[in-house]
């Protein structure tokens, strides 16, 4: 299955449950029949016991790792007991394939999982999606960093946060998705125990950093809206927020250095983690969900609630006012009571969109994993397909952020449009852009023409008024507005 997941507890949780129930399984089903083929390869069936060679072949067939994230493990795995009969208990690492609640027993029906195919989206589709994600994440975030480097003279706190978030997302693509692709090709872990700990630590750290840099960005937007005139220590505070985000990410990643180690799993060396019991996995996943999603989401929600309240309390950013001498048509000007620049509001909208995408991408994954470790996900082929889709949403967050930058930042779009392949794409949209520009110019020109006509009428009226004041007993009417008539008496000679 495609599960680009950071904290995949399903395999380890399933193996722990299977090890506890292996004694019961060996006493009740010493020989299992397999009809046809299962998953990606066939398993010899009938009443025959499996030889070590057959077991190795089965393990190689079912051991398709999905390792792009922190708790990464084989998608489907066939575990064997140490008994002489080589009883095979097939377990699945997908969230949709949990054992019974509590994890202390397998299904009473030995053929329940025979028709379930954990390779719902098989290797070709998985590799295709992985390569697409990797390409979009790396190219998109590299393009954003390139734009920030080209326009480094235009410094702003928002650009600083965007650069840090793009750097974290780029690391997600290079360390998580690329590692997943490589491990799917090699099957076994071949880098050693030290590299196992270092790479796992790096994967967790960049995942946390992508989240907590977003939290820091939200806090900065909160400060920019609630204290719009506070410029004295804004840059220093922004740097402290980013440094704190990376420091918190590193601290939350430290347990990985202890939990992960290189182990021999089914005859293949793997970078592995074992917690021992389903309860331990429930506690672990609860902590991960809180630190990776729940706490950041609460902080971000609180910041934006205060931002919305502040903007609402200060009134509209642009208030309507009547144009002097041109009827009641509303004009827009900055409010003198609460000055919040238009650019600052635009950055708030962009950050809010990034936060919304973050919640959309992560909440299904977190909820699904929690339901899995607590035994609330039933076994079915449909759930495998659902899990495959949900698990692909996490890295989509890193792929979507660059698109949001281009959508909200004209600077990013203009800079990228000067370089291929973005230049080729903008050329395709040239005709549409020209038509839109002509329509805008026509509208603006018509408004300017009407405005000039009105000014010309007022100037003519004032000229007539000034000339008429030299005549005795003359009365001049200035037609400034059709609804109002102003009468000016002529100056009389002194007697």
Curated annotation (Swiss-Prot):
Stretches for region Disordered: 24-45
Biased composition (Low complexity): 24-33
Example of a GO MF term: vasopressin receptor activity
Compartments it resides in: Cell membrane
InterPro entries associated with the record: GPCR_Rhodpsn (IPR000276), GPCR_Rhodpsn_7TM (IPR017452), Neuropeptide-GPCR (IPR052665), Vasoprsn_rcpt (IPR001817)
Tissue: In adults, expressed abundantly in the head and very weakly in the body.
Chain ranges passing through the membrane: 55-75, 130-150, 165-185, 240-260, 288-308, 354-374, 384-404
UniProt keyword annotation of Magnesium present: no
Cytoplasmic compartment segments: 76-129, 186-239, 309-353, 405-495
Glycosylation sites: 35
The UniProt record lists the keyword Membrane: yes
Gene Ontology BP term (one): G protein-coupled receptor signaling pathway
Topological category with respect to the lipid bilayer: Multi-pass membrane protein
Its biological purpose: Binds to the cardioactive peptide (CCAP), which is a neuropeptide.
Stated name of the protein: Cardioacceleratory peptide receptor
Biological classification of the source: Eukaryota, Metazoa, Ecdysozoa, Arthropoda, Hexapoda
């Amino acid at each position: 299955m495609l599960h680009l997941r950071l904290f995949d507890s399903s395999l380890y949780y399933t193996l722990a449950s299977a090890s506890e129930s292996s004694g019961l399984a060996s006493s009740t089903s010493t020989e299992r029949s397999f009809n046809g083929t299962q998953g990606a390869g066939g398993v010899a069936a009938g009443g025959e016991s499996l030889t070590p060679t057959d077991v190795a072949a089965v393990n190689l067939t079912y051991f398709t790792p999905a390792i792009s994230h922190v708790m990464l493990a084989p998608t489907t795995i066939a575990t064997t007991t140490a008994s002489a009969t080589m009883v095979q208990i097939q377990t699945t690492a997908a969230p949709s394939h949990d054992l019974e609640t509590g994890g202390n027993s397998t299904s009473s029906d030995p053929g329940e999982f025979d028709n379930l195919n954990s390779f719902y989206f098989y290797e070709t589709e998985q590799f295709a999606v992985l390569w697409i994600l990797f390409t979009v994440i790396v190219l998109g975030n590299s393009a954003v960093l390139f734009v920030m480097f080209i326009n480094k003279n235009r410094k702003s706190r928002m650009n600083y946060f965007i650069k840090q978030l793009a750097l974290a997302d780029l690391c997600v693509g290079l360390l998580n998705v690329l590692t997943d692709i490589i491990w799917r090709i090699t099957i076994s872990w071949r880098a050693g125990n030290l590299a196992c700990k270092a790479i796992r630590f790096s994967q967790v750290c960049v995942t946390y950093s992508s989240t907590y840099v977003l939290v820091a960005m939200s806090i900065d937007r909160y400060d920019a809206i609630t204290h719009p005139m506070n410029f004295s220590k804004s840059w220093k505070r922004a740097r402290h927020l980013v440094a704190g985000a990376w420091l918190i990410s590193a601290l939350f990643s430290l347990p990985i250095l202890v939990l992960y180690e290189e182990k021999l799993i089914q005859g293949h060396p793997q970078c592995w983690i074992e917690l021992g019991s389903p309860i331990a996995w429930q506690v672990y996943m609860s902590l991960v969900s809180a630190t990776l999603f729940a706490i950041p989401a609460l902080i971000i929600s609180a910041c934006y609630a205060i931002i919305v309240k502040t903007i609402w309390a200060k009134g509209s950013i642009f208030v309507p006012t009547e144009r002097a001498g041109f009827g009641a048509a509303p004009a827009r000007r900055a409010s003198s009571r609460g000055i919040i620049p238009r650019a600052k509001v635009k950055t708030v909208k962009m950050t809010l969109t990034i936060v919304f995408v973050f919640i959309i991408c992560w909440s299904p994954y977190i909820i699904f994993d929690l339901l899995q470790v607590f035994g609330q996900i039933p076994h079915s082929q449909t759930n495998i397909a659902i899990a495959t889709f949900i698990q692909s949403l996490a890295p989509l967050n890193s792929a979507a952020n660059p698109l949001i930058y281009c959508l909200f930042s004209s600077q990013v779009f203009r800079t990228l449009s000067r370089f291929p392949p973005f230049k080729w794409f903008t050329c395709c949209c040239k005709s549409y852009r020209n038509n839109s520009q002509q329509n805008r110019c026509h509208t603006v020109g018509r408004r300017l023409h009407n405005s000039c006509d009105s000014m010309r009428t007022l100037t003519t009226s004032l000229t007539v008024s000034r000339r008429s004041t030299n005549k005795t007993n003359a009365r001049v009417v200035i037609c400034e507005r059709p609804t109002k008539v102003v009468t000016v008496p002529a100056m009389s000679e002194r007697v």
